Amino acid sequence: KIKYHLEIFSQEPKELNFNLEEDITGLDQVVVSASRTGQLRQTAPVIVSVTSSKDFQATQSISLSEGLNFQPGLRMETNCQNCGFSQVRMNGLDGAYSQILIKSRPIFSALNGVYGLDQIPANSIERVEVVRGGGSALYGSNAIAGTINIITKEPTENLFEIASNFAAIGGKAGDQAVSLNGIVLSNDYKTGLSIFGMFRDRKPFDQNGDGFTEITKVENKTFGFNSFFKPGERSKLSLDFHTIHE
């Protein structure tokens, strides 16, 4: 919030210099998962935990599942040694009892909520809002344990980013990930397009040499885009597309 009182009695221009301080606690940010409408976090009727894009960058998270490890009250766990799928556990309940949303819409099915968390690139996420407990049932019958609302990035400026990340599991198995993100805006800011993608190749890892991998091989490709058109000041048409292959 910026509050400044200024009185000008002449026609001469007046120059003002001021500094903005970052809100460390994040209480003034707007969330939509509390009541399905945008409101300040400090006035929301339920507790909403937010993980921003800065948190994904600080933790070097490649996918959504890696970033959720740092969210209070959530736990990512691997439940299958054969396929290596991971699910989020909230309030001690399995992933099937949590509702996963993209821009407040229940696009994810119960099956995709298990396998899809590893395939959403972190560079496409603006923030993740988490509501724990029965109050999140506002979004559907699956939201018994809680709701995870994924807010993707809105096109705000023209840019293109490409990043590569390599990790060695146990000094043996390589994990290579390449991600890209591009935004194109019109001159009047009424039309915008944001594209994102990720390619990941993870080699299998066998710790004790018994022929069974503790960490399975993964090769997935993810691509999608977000677009919008504003025909008026209070109207907006949006079109989103996501494709995932593993």
Model-identified regions with their sequence ranges:
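Transmembrane beta-barrel outer-membrane domains
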Residues: T25, Q81, S141, G171-D175, ...
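Periplasmic-side early beta-strands and strand-to-turn transitions of outer-membrane beta-barrels
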Residues: F160-N165, I183-E246
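Short, acidic, small-residue-rich periplasmic hinge/interaction motif at the N-terminus
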Residues: F9-Q57, G95
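Short acidic/polar hinge/loop motifs at secondary-structure boundaries
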Residues: Q87-R89, R105-R132, K153
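Non-catalytic regulatory/gating segments with a bias toward low-complexity or hydrophobic composition
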Residues: L68, V128-E129, I148-I150
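Short strand-turn segments of transmembrane beta-barrel domains in outer membranes
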Residues: G135-S136, T147, K153-V184, T216
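Membrane-embedded beta-strand positions in outer-membrane beta-barrel channels/transporters
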Residues: N17, Q87, R127, T147, ...
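Short, polar/charged loop or turn motifs at beta-strand boundaries
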Residues: V46-L64, Q87-L93, K103, A168-G170
